[in-house]
């Protein structure tokens, strides 16, 4: 049965109208050797055969214990969360088109905004962005629009920003006249040296970007950088891991006046690892900047009969006003992921989040301490971290990671591709899912691998 709706006479009429002799002629700009004449699809199979086939394919997966981190984190997600998310009311109506007709969906987003504003200490939150990297790019654009006192479209960025975030930021802003200056990393402690900021004191910046914990896992000197930025007329954009905020002070408490905009990757709070996505970005801000905030914002209101309800508010988006005037051209938010995050935070509560964050830090501390006891292995930076730490090895780190895979362990993130000075370094991450037995197995596997490859 053909699922192409056009009849042969309809196709002929369309081809005659545009002056083409055949459908193939429409694609003649594609070289012949790149075209697929046949799809080589086998005959259909029944459900039992399909289940057996997929089971065989699933058995090819390697179920390694994961210590990678670097922006995407393995956390336990209670079964109830995605069981609730998969309900039809959420699963098929996750994005608020004809929004007011879906009061339940709007309330979930409103609760999410409330929780994220509380977690970050900000006044307002939007309904989410695509991911952490695009949330940062939108935050930079927002800061430039909002900082009316700035005489330039320059942004100052600490070198320890996640490299993928930086690439996405450069891509999105490439043709918008925005320039970036980078503050070099202090190689001794893995973070920005506040005293180096004075080298940039004579340049006018619209915003300063601070990531903490930074890409190398270190906690930045957020107070010093925030105060410096505000002293020089720049807005502060905080990039952070939401899970870390359960035990660290919120960006609203950075420096004397706090950050102005907060963004980051929401994956750690209820979203599983899935080959890079879908995840979701979050963004919160002070009320002074809310009219420049992109994406959807849900507000609480009352209808004509005085009944409380929810609606989309401050809709300066491209669907409602001229594209050139819009604060955002995002076509949908990650509503389903937001639903998962909202349920995750609701079920765990403040104490549960704090417990997960604390155990993650403690397990990382234990792993790093035990690794440092191995001959030739050391902790690279002597400064505070959350749940990631850089480890120096006596061998090439990429080789070490490859060999550890044979021990059913994803040992960490190879940092050589990030910085040439870190060719013998990996970044390891532990969370609440790692048991003491897991950590012991990692240590023993490390000793075994180092002995095998000559460490």
Curated annotation (Swiss-Prot):
This protein's record includes keyword RNA-binding: no
Cleaved signal peptide residues: none
Gene Ontology molecular-function annotations: glycine dehydrogenase (decarboxylating) activity
Entry keyword annotation includes Lyase: no
Broad enzyme group: oxidoreductase
Annotated EC: 1.4.4.2
GO term, biological process aspect, one: glycine decarboxylation via glycine cleavage system
InterPro entries: GcvPA, GDC-P_N, GDC_P, PyrdxlP-dep_Trfase, PyrdxlP-dep_Trfase_major, PyrdxlP-dep_Trfase_small
Catalyses which reaction(s): N(6)-[(R)-lipoyl]-L-lysyl-[glycine-cleavage complex H protein] + glycine + H(+) = N(6)-[(R)-S(8)-aminomethyldihydrolipoyl]-L-lysyl-[glycine-cleavage complex H protein] + CO2
Swiss-Prot/TrEMBL keywords: Oxidoreductase
Family: Belongs to the GcvP family. N-terminal subunit subfamily.
Functional description taken from the UniProt entry: The glycine cleavage system catalyzes the degradation of glycine. The P protein binds the alpha-amino group of glycine through its pyridoxal phosphate cofactor; CO(2) is released and the remaining methylamine moiety is then transferred to the lipoamide cofactor of the H protein.
Quaternary structure and partners: The glycine cleavage system is composed of four proteins: P, T, L and H. In this organism, the P 'protein' is a heterodimer of two subunits.
Name assigned to this protein: Probable glycine dehydrogenase (decarboxylating) subunit 1
Annotated source species: Francisella tularensis subsp. holarctica (strain LVS)
């Amino acid at each position: 049965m053909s699922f192409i709706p056009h009849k042969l006479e309809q196709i002929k009429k369309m081809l005659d109208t545009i002056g083409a002799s055949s459908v193939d002629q429409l694609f003649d700009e594609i070289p012949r050797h790149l075209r697929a004449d046949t799809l080589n699809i086998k005959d259909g199979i029944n459900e039992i055969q399909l289940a057996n086939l997929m089971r065989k394919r699933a058995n090819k997966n390697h179920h390694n214990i994961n210590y990678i981190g670097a922006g995407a984190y393995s956390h336990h997600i209670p079964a109830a969360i995605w069981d609730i998310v998969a309900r039809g009311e959420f699963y098929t109506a996750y994005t608020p088109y004809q929004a007011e007709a879906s009061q339940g969906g709007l309330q979930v987003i409103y609760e999410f905004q409330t929780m994220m504003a509380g977690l970050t200490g900000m006044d307002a939150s939007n309904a989410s962005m695509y991911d952490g990297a695009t949330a940062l790019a939108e935050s930079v654009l927002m800061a430039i629009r909002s900082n009316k006192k700035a005489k330039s479209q320059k942004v100052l960025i600490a070198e320890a920003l996640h490299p993928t975030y930086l690439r996405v930021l450069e891509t999105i802003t490439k043709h918008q006249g925005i320039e970036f200056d980078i503050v070099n990393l202090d190689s001794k402690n893995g973070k920005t040296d506040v005293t180096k900021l004075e080298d940039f004191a004579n340049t006018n910046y619209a915003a300063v970007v601070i990531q903490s914990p930074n890409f190398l896992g270190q906690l930045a000197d957020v107070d010093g950088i925030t105060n410096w930025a505000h002293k020089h007329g720049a807005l502060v954009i905080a990039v952070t891991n939401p899970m870390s905020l359960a035990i660290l002070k919120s960006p609203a408490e950075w420096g004397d006046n706090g950050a102005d905009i907060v963004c980051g990757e929401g994956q750690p709070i209820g979203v599983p690892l899935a080959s890079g996505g879908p995840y979701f970005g979050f963004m919160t801000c002070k009320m002074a900047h809310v009219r420049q905030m992109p994406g959807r914002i849900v507000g609480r209101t009352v209808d004509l009969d005085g009944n409380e309800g929810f609606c989309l508010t401050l809709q300066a988006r491209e669907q409602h006003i001229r594209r050139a005037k819009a604060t955002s051209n995002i076509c949908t938010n990650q509503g389903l992921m937001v639903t998962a995050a909202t349920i995750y935070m609701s079920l765990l509560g403040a104490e549960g989040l704090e417990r997960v964050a604390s155990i993650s830090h403690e397990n990382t501390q234990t792993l790093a301490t035990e690794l440092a006891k191995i001959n030739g292995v050391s902790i690279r930076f002597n400064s505070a971290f959350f749940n990631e730490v850089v480890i120096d090895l006596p061998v090439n780190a990429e080789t070490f990671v490859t060999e550890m895979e044979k021990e059913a362990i994803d040992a960490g993130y190879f940092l050589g591709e990030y910085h040439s000075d870190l060719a013998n370094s990996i970044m390891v991450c532990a969370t609440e899912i790692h048991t003491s037995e897991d950590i012991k197995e990692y240590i023993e596997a490390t000793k075994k691998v180092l002995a095998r490859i000559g460490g």
